[in-house]
């Protein structure tokens, strides 16, 4: 099963002239408890943190010390297991053109992990999702928390941000972390079975 998935992933490399593709554990909301476990799908690794790099001929799984034994049990048949710290220094991928879904990485991660020794191509579709057939994400409703619980309503919080923007002569602010949006708007949701934080940006 994993071998078939890896082949389907590699079959997409030619379209983007890729030498490899990087798959993180987190989703676009940087939650380790994602409804889309792309890393688990392509590697069979079920830990809460890690990266897979699939090249044209080899597969690598980077995990930290918590998961070394687990990764060997779950993924060593198809992947070489490497300590997570070595992703910063490894020359395995030197001069390779690695494809990434930019929504799944911070700019710092891209600079530190990949641009140091490689070229990076931002792929405008997720190559794992192309073979990971799941139901479309359901739009779950949010619910609001009362001021008695939060201490301030969302209008009061937004007014503070607007005052800051005016003071700093800024036009807008982008809030990427769902937990910060949840705090600002006093909302919670049902997107995750393990957390009340809704999947959102602002």
State the predicted function of each range.
Residues 1-93, 104-105, 109-202:
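N-terminal accessory/capping or targeting/presequence segment of soluble
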């Amino acid at each position: 099963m994993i071998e078939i998935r890896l082949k389907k992933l590699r079959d997409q490399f030619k379209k983007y002239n890729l030498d490899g593709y990087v798959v993180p554990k987190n989703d676009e909301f940087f939650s380790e408890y994602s409804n889309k476990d792309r890393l688990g799908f392509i590697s069979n690794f079920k830990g809460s943190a890690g990266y897979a790099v699939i090249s044209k001929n080899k597969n690598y799984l980077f995990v930290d010390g918590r998961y070394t034994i687990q990764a060997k049990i779950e993924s060593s048949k198809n992947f070489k297991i490497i300590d997570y710290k070595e992703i910063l220094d490894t020359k395995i991928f030197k001069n390779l053109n690695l494809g990434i879904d930019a929504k799944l990485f911070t700019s710092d991660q891209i600079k530190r992990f990949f641009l140091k020794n490689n070229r990076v191509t931002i792929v405008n579709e997720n190559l794992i999702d192309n073979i990971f057939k799941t139901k479309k994400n359901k739009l779950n409703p949010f619910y609001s928390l009362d001021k008695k619980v939060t201490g301030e309503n969302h209008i009061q919080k937004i007014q503070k941000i607007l005052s800051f923007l005016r003071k700093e002569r800024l036009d807008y602010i982008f809030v990427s972390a769902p937990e910060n949006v949840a705090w600002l708007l006093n909302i919670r949701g049902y997107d995750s079975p393990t957390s009340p934080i809704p999947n959102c940006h602002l």
